[in-house]
Amino acid sequence: MNDVTLDDGTIIELKVAHIDDYQNGGYEYLYSWLSKVDQFLAKRYRVADLVKNKEQWLSRLNTNEITLLGLRQGKIIGSATLIMNDPQSRAAHVASFGVAVHPAFQRKGIGKLLISGLEQIALDRGIEKIEVNCYDGNAAAALYRSLNYASEGRRLRKGRLDNGTYVDELLFYKFINPF
């Protein structure tokens, strides 16, 4: 897609993911930092599951999902995936997304850039509504609100953290192509 210079001078390359981005240690690097932030994600990223998770991740590259990457010096430091419904579905006008940014690069605007890029891709594909969720306490909730995502609800005790405590899931939406 393009190179973007952040406020601190860091240059980030934004691009649509390709299988080559995950070769030569690319996926392993991504996985290593996802495992550090997975308490905020719906999926756990444990070292023992790396091979299985890599196979699943790569198999999704040719489905109704489009992933945008943020790269710094060729390393993946941000990832956002747009998940589109089956085109034959009555919910084909709705998509959802997930986003994660390397801990060292959070709060620098990378998440906002990735989400804005996904919104443009969704618009280009005729998507009207985008949904996203996160666990209560995740700083991403403030990011979604700052991008005009509205609250759609809350699922009580939807997630269970590694320490055994439960956390609610917050649901957000945004109409990007209003009817």
Segments (PLM) and residue ranges:
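Conserved catalytic-core motifs of GNAT/GCN5-like acyltransferases
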Residues: E131-C134, R145, A150-Y166
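Conserved GNAT acetyl-CoA-binding A-motif
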Residues: I115, A122-N133
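Short hydrophobic/aromatic beta-strand or adjacent loop that forms the aromatic wall/cage
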Residues: E65, V167-L171
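Short acidic-hydrophobic surface loop/beta-edge motif
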Residues: M1-D8, L68, R157-R160
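Conserved acetyl-CoA-binding loop-helix of GNAT-fold acetyltransferases
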Residues: V101, R107-A122, A141-S146
